[in-house]
UniProtKB/Swiss-Prot annotation:
Its main location: membrane. It is found in: Cell membrane. May form a heterooligomeric complex that consists of seven subunits: mnhA2, mnhB2, mnhC2, mnhD2, mnhE2, mnhF2 and mnhG2. Disulfide bonds: none annotated. This is Putative antiporter subunit mnhE2. Keywords: Antiport, Cell membrane, Ion transport, Membrane, Transmembrane, Transmembrane helix, Transport. The chain crosses the membrane at residues 22-42, 61-81, 102-122. It comes from the Bacteria. InterPro entries: Cation_antiport_E (IPR002758). It is a multi-pass membrane protein. GO terms for molecular function: antiporter activity; monoatomic cation transmembrane transporter activity. The gene is mnhE2.
Protein backbone atom coordinates (compact mmCIF):
# COMPACT_ATOMS: atom_id res chain seq x y z
CA UNK A 1 0.00 0.00 0.00
CA UNK A 2 2.89 2.32 0.77
CA UNK A 3 4.33 1.77 -2.68
CA UNK A 4 1.06 2.74 -4.37
CA UNK A 5 0.76 5.92 -2.31
CA UNK A 6 4.38 6.81 -2.98
CA UNK A 7 3.80 6.27 -6.70
CA UNK A 8 0.80 8.63 -6.65
CA UNK A 9 2.84 11.25 -4.76
CA UNK A 10 5.64 10.97 -7.34
CA UNK A 11 3.08 11.41 -10.13
CA UNK A 12 1.65 14.55 -8.50
CA UNK A 13 5.14 15.94 -7.95
CA UNK A 14 5.86 15.32 -11.62
CA UNK A 15 2.74 17.30 -12.53
CA UNK A 16 3.85 20.18 -10.26
CA UNK A 17 7.37 20.23 -11.69
CA UNK A 18 6.03 20.46 -15.25
CA UNK A 19 4.72 23.97 -14.50
CA UNK A 20 1.71 23.68 -16.77
CA UNK A 21 -1.29 26.00 -16.55
CA UNK A 22 -3.79 23.19 -16.08
CA UNK A 23 -3.79 19.62 -14.86
CA UNK A 24 -3.28 17.17 -17.70
CA UNK A 25 -3.96 13.50 -17.32
CA UNK A 26 -1.16 12.68 -19.75
CA UNK A 27 1.36 14.46 -17.52
CA UNK A 28 0.05 12.61 -14.47
CA UNK A 29 0.29 9.30 -16.36
CA UNK A 30 3.88 10.08 -17.38
CA UNK A 31 4.68 10.85 -13.74
CA UNK A 32 3.04 7.61 -12.68
CA UNK A 33 5.20 5.65 -15.13
CA UNK A 34 8.31 7.40 -13.83
CA UNK A 35 7.16 6.56 -10.30
CA UNK A 36 6.81 2.90 -11.27
CA UNK A 37 10.40 2.91 -12.51
CA UNK A 38 11.69 4.64 -9.35
CA UNK A 39 9.78 2.33 -7.03
CA UNK A 40 10.90 -0.75 -8.96
CA UNK A 41 14.52 0.30 -8.51
CA UNK A 42 14.02 1.08 -4.80
CA UNK A 43 11.46 -1.58 -3.79
CA UNK A 44 14.09 -3.68 -1.99
CA UNK A 45 14.36 -0.94 0.64
CA UNK A 46 10.65 -1.26 1.47
CA UNK A 47 11.04 -4.85 2.63
CA UNK A 48 8.19 -5.88 0.34
CA UNK A 49 7.87 -7.22 -3.15
CA UNK A 50 7.16 -4.82 -5.98
CA UNK A 51 3.46 -3.95 -5.86
CA UNK A 52 2.77 -4.42 -9.57
CA UNK A 53 3.71 -8.10 -9.21
CA UNK A 54 0.44 -8.64 -7.33
CA UNK A 55 -1.43 -6.80 -10.06
CA UNK A 56 0.13 -9.15 -12.62
CA UNK A 57 -0.81 -12.19 -10.51
CA UNK A 58 -4.36 -10.84 -10.26
CA UNK A 59 -4.61 -10.46 -14.03
CA UNK A 60 -3.21 -13.96 -14.51
CA UNK A 61 -5.65 -15.30 -11.94
CA UNK A 62 -8.59 -13.64 -13.69
CA UNK A 63 -7.51 -15.07 -17.06
CA UNK A 64 -7.18 -18.60 -15.66
CA UNK A 65 -10.52 -18.37 -13.89
CA UNK A 66 -12.35 -17.08 -16.98
CA UNK A 67 -10.81 -19.87 -19.06
CA UNK A 68 -11.90 -22.48 -16.49
CA UNK A 69 -15.37 -20.96 -16.27
CA UNK A 70 -15.89 -21.01 -20.03
CA UNK A 71 -14.54 -24.53 -20.54
CA UNK A 72 -16.52 -25.99 -17.64
CA UNK A 73 -19.67 -24.21 -18.83
CA UNK A 74 -19.20 -25.70 -22.30
CA UNK A 75 -18.70 -29.14 -20.75
CA UNK A 76 -21.92 -28.82 -18.73
CA UNK A 77 -23.84 -27.66 -21.82
CA UNK A 78 -22.45 -30.68 -23.68
CA UNK A 79 -23.62 -33.02 -20.88
CA UNK A 80 -27.07 -31.45 -20.79
CA UNK A 81 -27.63 -31.58 -24.53
CA UNK A 82 -25.93 -34.81 -25.55
CA UNK A 83 -24.75 -36.98 -22.65
CA UNK A 84 -27.51 -36.99 -20.03
CA UNK A 85 -27.39 -40.80 -19.84
CA UNK A 86 -23.60 -40.87 -19.49
CA UNK A 87 -23.49 -38.80 -16.31
CA UNK A 88 -21.55 -40.31 -13.45
CA UNK A 89 -22.11 -37.97 -10.47
CA UNK A 90 -20.23 -38.56 -7.26
CA UNK A 91 -17.98 -37.25 -4.53
CA UNK A 92 -14.33 -36.33 -4.84
CA UNK A 93 -12.03 -35.55 -1.93
CA UNK A 94 -9.26 -33.01 -2.22
CA UNK A 95 -6.50 -32.30 0.30
CA UNK A 96 -5.39 -28.69 0.30
CA UNK A 97 -2.16 -27.05 1.38
CA UNK A 98 -3.81 -23.70 2.13
CA UNK A 99 -3.51 -22.45 5.70
CA UNK A 100 -5.48 -19.23 6.17
CA UNK A 101 -9.25 -19.16 6.53
CA UNK A 102 -9.62 -16.61 3.72
CA UNK A 103 -7.57 -18.80 1.37
CA UNK A 104 -9.74 -21.84 2.10
CA UNK A 105 -12.89 -19.75 1.74
CA UNK A 106 -11.71 -18.28 -1.56
CA UNK A 107 -10.90 -21.74 -2.95
CA UNK A 108 -14.31 -22.96 -1.82
CA UNK A 109 -16.03 -20.07 -3.60
CA UNK A 110 -14.05 -20.73 -6.79
CA UNK A 111 -15.05 -24.39 -6.75
CA UNK A 112 -18.70 -23.57 -6.08
CA UNK A 113 -19.08 -20.98 -8.83
CA UNK A 114 -17.40 -23.20 -11.41
CA UNK A 115 -20.20 -25.13 -13.16
CA UNK A 116 -20.44 -28.85 -12.49
CA UNK A 117 -18.96 -28.96 -8.99
CA UNK A 118 -19.81 -27.82 -5.51
CA UNK A 119 -18.18 -28.18 -2.11
CA UNK A 120 -20.38 -30.21 0.20
CA UNK A 121 -18.18 -30.22 3.27
CA UNK A 122 -14.82 -29.08 4.57
CA UNK A 123 -13.08 -31.07 7.30
CA UNK A 124 -12.65 -29.55 10.76
CA UNK A 125 -8.93 -29.10 10.13
CA UNK A 126 -9.81 -27.18 6.94
CA UNK A 127 -7.48 -29.40 4.95
CA UNK A 128 -9.88 -31.72 3.14
CA UNK A 129 -12.67 -30.76 0.75
CA UNK A 130 -15.56 -33.06 -0.12
CA UNK A 131 -16.70 -32.03 -3.57
CA UNK A 132 -19.75 -33.20 -5.51
CA UNK A 133 -19.07 -33.31 -9.23
CA UNK A 134 -21.43 -33.97 -12.12
CA UNK A 135 -19.02 -36.54 -13.57
CA UNK A 136 -16.38 -38.43 -11.58
CA UNK A 137 -15.06 -40.64 -14.35
CA UNK A 138 -11.28 -40.84 -14.25
CA UNK A 139 -10.75 -38.29 -17.03
CA UNK A 140 -13.20 -35.72 -15.63
CA UNK A 141 -12.00 -36.25 -12.07
CA UNK A 142 -8.41 -35.53 -13.13
CA UNK A 143 -9.54 -32.39 -14.98
CA UNK A 144 -11.40 -31.19 -11.87
CA UNK A 145 -8.44 -31.86 -9.57
CA UNK A 146 -6.08 -30.16 -12.02
CA UNK A 147 -8.21 -27.01 -12.09
CA UNK A 148 -8.46 -26.99 -8.27
CA UNK A 149 -4.67 -27.34 -7.99
CA UNK A 150 -4.31 -24.47 -10.46
CA UNK A 151 -6.65 -22.30 -8.37
CA UNK A 152 -4.76 -23.24 -5.23
CA UNK A 153 -1.41 -22.33 -6.78
CA UNK A 154 -2.71 -18.93 -7.85
CA UNK A 155 -4.19 -18.28 -4.40
CA UNK A 156 -0.81 -19.10 -2.84
CA UNK A 157 0.87 -16.76 -5.32
CA UNK A 158 -1.51 -13.93 -4.40
CA UNK A 159 -1.06 -14.61 -0.68
CA UNK A 160 2.75 -14.27 -0.79
Amino acid sequence: MRQVLLNIVIAFLWVLFQDEDSFKLSTFFAGYLIGILVIYILHRFFGQQFYLKKVWVGIKFLAVYLYQLITSSMTIINYILFKTKDLNPGLVTYETTLDNDWEVTFLTILIIITPGSTVIRISKEKKKFFIHAIDVSDKEKQKLLKSIRQYEGLILEVAE
